[in-house]
Amino acid sequence: MLVLSRKVNESIKINSDIEVLILEIKKDTVKIAIKAPENIKIFRSEIYKFIIEENKKSILKDKHNISKIKSLFNHYFKNEN
């Protein structure tokens, strides 16, 4: 992990296309601006963790539903013969 100190109106560059600018520092809060290409997704970490958890729940639900559908198809086709 790289640790840097920055003052208000100073920035860091990540590769050539991402810039993180320090806008404001108050007590225990730092306000930043991030300039990045539109195809780069930027999330607050707590939001990103929430998205990951919701995606995991969705996958488990889908697996359960697929299993139910498979069971119904198997039951249906066994009764057709």
From Swiss-Prot:
GO biological process, one term: regulation of bacterial-type flagellum assembly
Gene3D superfamilies from the UniProt entry: Translational regulator CsrA
Compartment(s) where it occurs, according to its Swiss-Prot or TrEMBL record: Cytoplasm
Protein name: Translational regulator CsrA
Free-text function comment from the UniProt entry: A translational regulator that binds mRNA to regulate translation initiation and/or mRNA stability. Usually binds in the 5'-UTR at or near the Shine-Dalgarno sequence preventing ribosome-binding, thus repressing translation. Its main target seems to be the major flagellin gene, while its function is anatagonized by FliW.
Domain of life of the native organism: Bacteria
Organism encoding this protein: Borrelia garinii subsp. bavariensis (strain ATCC BAA-2496 / DSM 23469 / PBi)
PANTHER family per record: CARBON STORAGE REGULATOR
Keyword Repressor belongs to the record: yes
Keyword line: Bacterial flagellum biogenesis, Cytoplasm, Repressor, RNA-binding, Translation regulation
